């Protein structure tokens, strides 16, 4: 059979499409498809990108991935991918892939911070890395070093990193970029339920009849989930109702039945309006509320997570905004919102007296009458006035929408499914707004039920599975345990077989504070894993300058030369997703594993290998000694009593354990491909056929045991019996993921509901359906809206909290700006690119589809400024400025007074402009709001 390229592409595409829908395939097309796939080895894997957790199938031939398709057996995506998903393979084959360690050196071959990058051996790289680490570790102690972790870590990578940093170095200065995306959601879960992660699952999409999308452009950021929402809507167009609530019009608006454009930060006011309406309409599910909830509130004067304005690093331009960290003038609209507290009037100066330490977290139980009093000022007239976000929409129209919103939530015959992502989480009151959406659902009793619940969507592929569940945050340990809890530290030390007292009880620096600590000279050695912090952190000019000009040493694990790699002193080339074994956990608590499919290029090695190899460089006597700076005693005597010699390395104690070698040999039957029976490679366990000279100067041949399985089986023990139960390693390689807790081989779809959750059945009272069994923060003092009144704490076992939190104005609201910064700036992602674009900008098809970041602007604003479409403009804030081209007809349509600039483009490094204010509870940065000027370049 003879066939040209065009005919071949046509027939293979037709064959694939026909097969997908069950149509018989012409023999010629079938033969063409079979010929081209000869010798391909298929295996299941997980998408590298967002937190949806789509299953994919990858095909390998001659040690290269030659095809990717959606996994038809995946219950998440059911065989389809989004545009990024189809290019999972191409991200690995960019022309400038890093394949050798690179160290800044002078002409003499010595490390020089101002030198040029030159290739070095792995041994030379680790020698310099060790030298610099020990210099600063001995100078500053455990608090002087840090690791920037990731929500894109595999679970095993994150677990190994936590062991090295917290058990090995006795530092808690490890924090993931998930701090930027999910920390507010975590605080909302902890504060409300006492345990992290969503109660529901993706099945809710098809079961519900009402979807509320709050600050979540699902059509671009979670496109596969949006396709499921779309399908459900099209199958039941008259009943299924979608509301899109956003600060600008986006692609979700196209399908939505109603769109509400609100003023940035005013979601707080809308939630309070809903709370008031639920009471006024007698829509409270009193049986649910009385049995399963209590009411609570906390302090309002908590600041905005900014630096002290007296810091020498705060510039004159920044100071007026940063001053609000200490005190602010209460506006007239805030005076109404805060009036139930009875402390502040319009024009008063609010001193931020509850900013330090745990004070922003303090909360106490209040009565229902106090709660009712608190929401009373949030009338339709008041909220419509403060919350309307589109100047061109009439007030009456906005009011009608708010009333319809309340109708939908309060309708007893409707289910209610609320989704959100960064619009809630990246928010100066992100923890509050998370608490308030639960307030609405709990009052209605529409929580933890099929089709009804408040559902936080995750942005990254393992922000849940690794960052949160493993505990790669500065304050966490595995399975929702906390470094500040003596009982939790003791459990962890026992599990890790390390001396009692090894773990540092003091919470480490969060992601943004690590940057500030580098600028302050408090941290002088930092290691970046699986993220791009010098592009993804707000107020980037400060952090880039500090990294490049101060006395410090920055190591970056990278696959491509992005912004952070170019800022670094040492770059370590690392494997990408299908060049290593791994596991991710997605937004519905589904854990999924994959096998290594291909060999990494050049000398690139897995992140896990770099962590374990670096652990060989530390003897116990160097790290488990006394650290006066951190007030940590020596645990060497206890270590010797456990049989550990001070000359042993952290590798010996943490990773190269005898039980690992005995119980998890390599090769392992689970590593055989289900289709061909061939053994998959495992770079860490047995080498991968390359001749790699390792960190010790010897040829790398593997650890000789199944590292990933050993780490998994140890890690999963943390959650067994504690409502975080995970299945064994082999099971995950036989299924398309499981939603934890996995008890007796069965996954859990809806948590806290005794009909579906074995832990809810265990803890619920006889005859009751729900038990909110999370153990954290389940004893509170009692008081009123002004503060706690009792010294005693009262148990809230198995109950959730209904919070009241007030509306407050953002610290950089253009409405109150007197310096000419008259536009809101919002930033975020786009469909075609992932985060900082380091991977996706190297895929030709994705680059062509979206080659640069644009400044999306309302046409009326553009006309007023004398701007035409695609004109080059300057977007300037108090912190910095960038140039971008104006787009007035694009997919994102801001109201007048707001511009949207995505952050995937390092040439439009918008984080130089963004404000580094955070939610004071979660420490998550508010990337969605800053005051800017826009003018022609």
UniProtKB/Swiss-Prot annotation:
Residues 1-31 form the signal peptide. Residues 40-96 form the 4Fe-4S Mo/W bis-MGD-type domain. Its cofactor is [4Fe-4S] cluster; Mo-bis(molybdopterin guanine dinucleotide). Binds 1 [4Fe-4S] cluster. Binds 1 molybdenum-bis(molybdopterin guanine dinucleotide) (Mo-bis-MGD) cofactor per subunit. It is an enzyme of class 1 (oxidoreductase). GO terms for biological process: Mo-molybdopterin cofactor biosynthetic process; nitrate assimilation. It is found in: Periplasm. Pfam families: Molybdop_Fe4S4, Molybdopterin, Molydop_binding, TAT_signal. Keywords: 4Fe-4S, Electron transport, Iron, Iron-sulfur, Metal-binding, Molybdenum, Nitrate assimilation, Oxidoreductase, Periplasm, Signal, Transport. One of its GO terms (cellular component) is membrane. Mo-bis(molybdopterin guanine dinucleotide) binds at residues 84, 152, 177, 181, 214-221, 422, 426, 532, 580, 607, 827-836, 911, 928. It catalyses: 2 Fe(II)-[cytochrome] + nitrate + 2 H(+) = 2 Fe(III)-[cytochrome] + nitrite + H2O. Belongs to the prokaryotic molybdopterin-containing oxidoreductase family. NasA/NapA/NarB subfamily. Component of the periplasmic nitrate reductase NapAB complex composed of NapA and NapB. This is Periplasmic nitrate reductase. It comes from Nautilia profundicola (strain ATCC BAA-1463 / DSM 18972 / AmH). The gene is napA.
